[in-house]
Amino acid sequence: MSKDQILEAIKGMSVLELNDLVKAIEEEFGVTAAAPVAVVAGGGAEAAAEQTEFTVNLVSGGASKINVIKVVRELTGLGLKEAKDLVDNAPKTLKEGVSKDEAEALKAKLEEAGAQVEVK
């Protein structure tokens, strides 16, 4: 199978199928799909610059956890168990390195479902 054929097969997969594929690759090769996090020590002048990347944190699942779990699954592509664990163990980071517009959209969707969310 060529690289192009593999890419075409991946393009035709749903989010759930892709999630299963990633898990299978992690298990087969003993790797993780987690993105490396770079830690940068910033100076005072850099802190004054406008922030361009934001982190969306789930503070609490609220009273309507089922709706929040559904939205978390939709936004992250996680499976039911993973989304439930994330909501049950809040506060947790939901997404990192997103634009301000995307962060606000995520926050609005989650708050509409009943979650408490903070954007940093």
Swiss-Prot record:
Alphabetically list the UniProt keywords.
Ribonucleoprotein, Ribosomal protein
Gene Ontology biological-process entries: translation
Q: Does the keyword Ribosomal protein apply?
A: yes
Which cellular component terms (GO) are annotated to the entry? cytosolic large ribosomal subunit
State the Gene3D superfamilies in the record: 3.30.1390.10, Single helix bin
Is the Ribonucleoprotein keyword given for this protein?
A: yes
Briefly state the protein's biological role.
Answer: Forms part of the ribosomal stalk which helps the ribosome interact with GTP-bound translation factors. Is thus essential for accurate translation.
In which family does this protein belong, per the annotation?
Belongs to the bacterial ribosomal protein bL12 family.
Its subunit composition reads:
Homodimer. Part of the ribosomal stalk of the 50S ribosomal subunit. Forms a multimeric L10(L12)X complex, where L10 forms an elongated spine to which 2 to 4 L12 dimers bind in a sequential fashion. Binds GTP-bound translation factors.
Q: What is this protein called?
A: Large ribosomal subunit protein bL12
